[in-house]
């Protein structure tokens, strides 16, 4: 399928039986879009924030979330090669670099001797960053999204 070649992260995704009837999805949409529409931000339907690794679109597993917040959870798997999330190897320095990208900016977090050390620095920084954004948006997002962000764990296998 051509769409899966362009966006392989959706390859194994499914839609719940209930939402295969568009009027059921439309009703859910209209009830939940109000939670987020009152804020002057672009928003997206997300399947991964409430349940990490989720592949099913359903009323229990997805939520509307501001686009900026959703961008915190992209993992760049197709672009990062053999290294964990937030890590690349600098051939000139011969070190592993911990790096976080957000809103088009790269934040260099340090150079390390091992992949694991670089990843741990990235993990610590990114989890704190997600918590900071959650706190800043606490009054703008549903509590279930806030709680998911406050409890988010980044793993070396992500």
Predicted feature locations:
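Extended, polar beta-sheet/loop recognition surfaces of beta-rich domains
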Residues: 129-158
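Active-site proximal helix-loop segment of RNase H-like, two-metal nucleases, encompassing DDE(D)
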Residues: 1-2, 97-107
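Structured segments of extracytoplasmic/periplasmic soluble domains
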Residues: 28-32, 125-128, 132
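Short, cationic Gly/His-enriched loop motifs
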Residues: 5-95, 99-100
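Residue-level signal for secondary-structure boundary elements
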Residues: 2-3, 37, 130, 134
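A short, exposed loop/beta-hairpin motif centered on an aromatic-Gly-Thr core
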Residues: 11-16, 105-116
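An aromatic-rich alpha-helical recognition segment common to small helix-rich domains
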Residues: 25, 87, 98, 112-126
């Amino acid at each position: 399928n051509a769409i899966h070649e362009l966006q392989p992260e959706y390859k194994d995704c499914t839609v719940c039986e209930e939402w295969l009837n568009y009027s059921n999805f439309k009703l859910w949409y209209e009830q939940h879009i109000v939670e987020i529409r009152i804020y002057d931000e672009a928003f997206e339907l997300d399947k991964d924030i409430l349940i990490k690794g989720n592949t099913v679109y359903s009323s229990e597993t997805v939520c509307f979330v501001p686009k900026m917040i959703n961008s915190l959870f992209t993992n760049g798997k197709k672009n990062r090669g053999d290294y964990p999330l937030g890590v690349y190897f600098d051939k000139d320095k011969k070190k592993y670099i911990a790096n976080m990208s957000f809103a088009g900016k790269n934040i260099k977090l340090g150079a390390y001797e091992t992949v694991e050390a670089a990843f741990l620095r990235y993990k610590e920084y990114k989890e704190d960053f997600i918590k900071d954004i959650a706190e800043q948006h606490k009054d703008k997002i549903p509590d279930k999204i806030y709680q998911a962000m406050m409890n988010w764990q980044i793993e070396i296998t992500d």
